[in-house]
Amino acid sequence: MTDKELLEQLRTEVVAETPDCWSAILARVQAPAQQPEEEKVVPMPEHGRRRGAWKRWVAAAAVFFLAVLGGGLYATQVPGGVATLDANPSIELTVNKLGRVLSARACNPDAQFVLDDLELRNQSLQTAADEIVAAMQTDGYLSADTNSVLVTVEAGKGDARLRDRLAAAVESAQTDCGMDPAVLAQVLEVDPELEVYASAAGVSAGKAMLIRQISDQVQDLSGEELVSLPINDLNILAASNDVAFSGMASIGAASTGAYIPYDEALQVALERCGLTADDVTQASMRFTLIDGEMVMEFALSDGERNYVCSVDAETAEVCRLTG
């Protein structure tokens, strides 16, 4: 077989084995154009993204909770004010920023006697005032006849807000105990001289300030005489001698029930002066001290003569007579 014949045979065999694609290609080219089928988009799950956002919210909430908790713990432990309650017992209360008692300290032996049976830590101001007033009443330091309490707050440690809250708490406690309330309340500025005097006299700085205000305005009442008196007697003396308190609020009035009635004392004074009620054209009375004892001093006039008669406020004995 010649080369030409061999090549022709090979071409024939290749054509026979190769599929005829031309007709199919031609048919596709001649057919109308079709829109490609839109591919279906499968959304990716958002679990990962949501899980990340949830974690961030949890973290933020935890930070907020810790901040609030930390602030709350700070407010419960850090002193927010120091106040003293005086009747004759003198009790110092340190309170936190939420108005709860952190500690109670006795400033004199009478106060220690009162505090021995009390647990005031973590109590509210109202509860502490209720318990202190009730204990003072039980122990005889407060009663319907001796009803005055002095509230003193150190300046810069609670100031007027604490003073007002504690004064209101004491007023409420006295009412609950069946007393007519009598509360003196003050904010005390830092005064080194006053603190030295208070320490030497064995009294609170608040009581020392009350004594100073009385002795400064009433010539015949000295600090040495006043220092041993309970708060109720100081309150009586201040009111009777028209003391104008500076920086001190007053609620109610001091009771004089522990002393003889006015009419009884007046009758003793009239008899000692040789007068009758009809003879008197002018009369006045004030409480004062003679030898450290409370007396009722009557100034009487019959139009011709003037008398000053001092009657012991407890025994009704005449202590002094001039005129």
State the predicted function of each range.
Residues 21-33, 54-81:
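Single-pass transmembrane signal-anchor helices and their membrane-water interface zones
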Residues 1-48:
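Disordered, charged N-terminal biogenesis/targeting segments of membrane/secreted proteins
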Residues 44-47, 66-71, 287-295:
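Short, positively charged
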Residues 39-57, 64-65:
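Short hydrophobic short-linear motifs embedded
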Residues 74-323:
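Polar, acidic low-complexity tracts enriched in Ser/Thr/Gln/Glu with frequent Gly/Pro and Thr-Pro motifs
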Residues 9-16, 53-56, 299:
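Extended, compositionally biased low-complexity polar/Lys-Gly-rich tracts
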Residues 17, 49-52, 69, 282, ...:
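Alpha-helical structural elements
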